[in-house]
Amino acid sequence: MSGFVEKPEPIQVPGLVHLHTGKVRELYRNEAGDLVMVASDRISAYDWVLPTEIPDKGRVLTQLSLWWFDQLADLAPNHVLSTELPPGAPADWEGRALVCKSLRMVPVECVARGYLTGSGLAEYDETRTVCGLALPEGLVDGSELPAPIFTPATKAEVGEHDENVSYEEVARQVGADTAAALRQATLAVYSRARDIARERGIVLADTKFEFGFDGDDLVLADEVLTPDSSRFWPADRWQPGRAQPSYDKQFVRDWLTSAESGWDRKSEQPPPPLPQQVVDATRAKYVEAYELLTGQSWS
């Protein structure tokens, strides 16, 4: 069992039709047919959306995505139309709501990996491959790959796992031309972002993109290069052969699997609320990632 510990009731706004509640975002459609995407402060771990929120998290995700969209504008068009608050929207949406183009979304999570860790490491340890791509012997947790690789995954519903799939399977699902365009765009955007992050003392280990079509044009959508969609590591502490310190929700994962939480991940019981010190530490990591990458003060 997994999903929401406490599923939220979406806010109703005149002129907006609520379409979907995701792990973090609420999705609406306005009267012009555009989408309104609102990033909440919800946080998920181990396929559960937790009952405790992380203050400012949704704003950090939104503002960091906007910053990255600017850095990548010459490489990939994006879906953002406006950052203005829709009429009648609550003040709390300020800084976390985006008006976006309605796209024909491609049903593939486009993952780029420059370093080996996570599910890629688990697959490599068994087969010496990731998503069907052969990799050299001798790689360990945190190893830099000879070149970035495209390792797509299926898009799962809330509470379900994304599943890694081969490039050939993606080509069967969406067509050879679209698969090739996804791979090219994913690796180009990752490579640009990796270099920008490296200049700021951050290793971009891997990241996940979503794309959709606006007519015949492939457009970058959803969030980009945030601590929710990426693994960011401090470059000065990168050391292959161990789990890397990171700018993300690792504090949450570590506490949930500790004796202190009293939660058995293998049980079907929902996880407990987070203690304040874990909330504060997690918020600080998200803000630190924003400040290091953008060079701007959050407060």
From Swiss-Prot:
GO biological-process terms attached to the record: 'de novo' IMP biosynthetic process
Pfam families: SAICAR_synt
GO-annotated molecular function: ATP binding; phosphoribosylaminoimidazolesuccinocarboxamide synthase activity
Keyword terms of this UniProt record: ATP-binding, Ligase, Nucleotide-binding, Purine biosynthesis
Pathway: Purine metabolism; IMP biosynthesis via de novo pathway; 5-amino-1-(5-phospho-D-ribosyl)imidazole-4-carboxamide from 5-amino-1-(5-phospho-D-ribosyl)imidazole-4-carboxylate: step 1/2
Alphabetical list of PROSITE patterns matching this protein: SAICAR_SYNTHETASE_1, SAICAR_SYNTHETASE_2
Alphabetized Gene3D superfamilies for the sequence: ATP-grasp fold, B domain, Phosphorylase Kinase, domain 1
InterPro entries xrefs: SAICAR_synt/ADE2_N, SAICAR_synth, SAICAR_synthetase_CS
Reaction equations catalysed: 5-amino-1-(5-phospho-D-ribosyl)imidazole-4-carboxylate + L-aspartate + ATP = (2S)-2-[5-amino-1-(5-phospho-beta-D-ribosyl)imidazole-4-carboxamido]succinate + ADP + phosphate + 2 H(+)
Entries under SUPFAM superfamilies matching the protein: SAICAR synthase-like
EC numbers on record: 6.3.2.6
Enzyme class: ligase
Family: Belongs to the SAICAR synthetase family.
UniProt xrefs under HAMAP family: SAICAR_synth
Protein name: Phosphoribosylaminoimidazole-succinocarboxamide synthase
Phylogenetic placement of the source organism: Bacteria, Bacillati, Actinomycetota, Actinomycetes, Kitasatosporales
